[in-house]
Design a protein with these regions (language model features):
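Solvent-exposed, charged helical/coil patches
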Residues: 1-53, 124-125, 129-153
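Conserved catalytic cores of phosphodiester-cleaving nucleases, focusing on short active-site segments
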Residues: 31, 75-91, 104
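A short acidic/basic microdomain associated with nuclease active sites
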Residues: 48-66
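Short, solvent-exposed polar/charged micro-motifs at secondary-structure junctions
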Residues: 64-68, 124-125
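Basic/aromatic recognition patch in beta-strand/loop cores that engages polyanionic ligands
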Residues: 70-74
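Nucleic-acid nuclease catalytic cores
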Residues: 88-139
């Protein structure tokens, strides 16, 4: 089991905070009726403009019991090869949306993910940070992680 270090968590969480700030502005201007692809393009351009490497619609291959599955998953955004952002534009998030991101985290080995739903009346209550359970957290980070990342993947 890999151990998260504070520098890595703070770096990724800083990106998450910037994406959320930007997303709240986008949602207040566009509302909840644009296509998911519109929100995705805006976030991709915002992150790229701010110096991040962003892969959009990144195809992910994985190995299952020795069988190589090529292009088995497609993540919405992979930022700096460390953060997976999954976007939705639905009335409300359902358990399968969380499981989808959790699966992406598990099969890619990434530690943190962000799920954002632009389909609600507000972004409040329509986003979640997910922590991959394959990572353990040092004692010094336990309380911080519980506050910032309440949903485990």
């Amino acid at each position: 089991m890999a151990v998260l270090n504070m520098d890595e968590v703070l770096k990724i969480d800083s990106i998450i905070d910037r994406v959320l700030d930007f997303s709240f502005g986008v949602h207040s201007r566009l509302g909840s009726f644009a296509l998911e692809s519109s929100y995705k393009t805006l976030i991709e351009k915002f992150l790229t403009k701010n110096g991040h490497k962003v892969e959009c619609e990144k195809l992910i291959s994985f190995n299952y019991d020795g069988i190589e599955i090529v292009n088995g998953f497609r993540v919405d955004l992979l930022v700096d090869d460390s953060l997976i952002i999954e976007l939705k534009a639905v009335k409300s998030l359902a358990p399968e949306h969380y499981r989808q991101l959790a699966t992406y985290l598990r099969f890619t080995g990434k530690s943190l993910g962000l799920l954002i739903n632009f389909g609600g009346n507000s972004l409040k209550g329509n986003f979640s940070r997910l922590l991959n359970r394959q990572f353990s957290v040092p004692e010094t980070l336990n309380e911080w992680i519980k506050v910032r990342h309440p949903f485990d993947a």
